[in-house]
Structures are given as C-alpha cells and as structure tokens.
Amino acid sequence: MALVSDHPLHLLGLRFPLRLRVTVRQGFVTLHNEITTKKLASGDSFVVPAFLRFACDVMPGRGKPAVFTLALEDDEPDGGHGGGKRWSQALAQHIFDTPQGKWTAARLAALWQVTPHKARARLFSEGEALLSLVREQRLAHALHTAAQADADGEQGERDLAQVAAGSGFASIPAFCDACVDVAGVRPSLFLRGPAPG
C-alpha cells in the first residue's frame, strides 16, 4: 500500500531508525535536509540513510493524486550510527519496534544498565531528549504503518484511532498534535483509503 495525497504535502522533521526507501508511483516527491535535495518523479526511488532527519514535499500530478511508498531496509552491518548518535539511534530502533511501551528514563536505564541520570545524559550528549525521541519515533511508526496498510492484507480505510493506538499514542488528539508539531501536517491528509490502481 502507499500513501496517497490529492493536495501538496510538506512533511517536516521525519527520521527513521533504519534506512528508508521512498518510491514514487505517481506524482512528485522532493526529499531534502539542510545539506542536499533529491527530486523524485513517477517510477523513481531513493534510500534515505538511517536516522537522518529530512523533509518530504509531496506534489500531486495534474488531476491525479501523488502516490508513494515507504519501506524500511535493514541497515548495513558496518554502517554508521546516525551521525555519531549511537545511543539515540539504538533507542529510536527500540521505540519504533515497540511504540506502545512506556518509555521512561527508568526503563531506558534498565535497558542500558545505567542510572536514569546517566541514560538521560547519554541522550543529551548526542543532542537528544527522551520525550522528543519517543514522540518522533511513534510518529515515524504511525506513518510507516499507514504506508503498509493493505500490504499486510488489511483492506479498506486506515483508521485514525487504530494507527494512533498501535503507534503508542494515548489518544487521537495526542496523535494529531504530534503530527502537526513534528511533521507539520494533520494526519487526515495521509490517512485515507487504498491507493488508486
């Protein structure tokens, strides 16, 4: 399944714990960060490196919606750790894998076998904060889940409540707030029925 948009979308602040292949089926997608820009048209794909923060501008074609897919790829075994963010990327992967978990400093400390203060200090030294990372990765999980609907045999509309709960958000308003605050869009813009043809 793919994400479909009849209107231009500007998704901001996206970051996934693994490499992400973006494939455009219809319309145009521009991926960019502070260093580079990659423009994709129908049939093009590009792999965004793991844990790289990027924006995604989606532009439908004339009279046709934009259709694109997101697929996580296993990281290369000798690949780097998110630009020197070893602890943050490892935590992001844990959060993405189990977004419904209660991600607290105590849980993180137990996972890393350090004190909660030391766990927070590790994230801080990499320019990250626990709650921000949790929110970001839950949203990444929700976006990936929305893109995977029907690929896993699910049919019909992607339900906002199911995506929100499955991605660890306490409520639909919390999910909507995260979409607006982190990605800059309302979830209703990308949570819709199956892609055309």
What is the predicted function of each stretch?
Residues W87-L130, A149-S167:
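DNA-binding recognition helix and immediately preceding turn/loop
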Residues V47, P60-P77:
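A short hydrophobic beta-strand segment most commonly corresponding to one strand
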Residues M1-R21, K38-L40:
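Conserved short histidine dyad/triad with adjacent acidic residue
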Residues N33-F54:
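Short acidic-glycine-tyrosine-enriched beta hairpin
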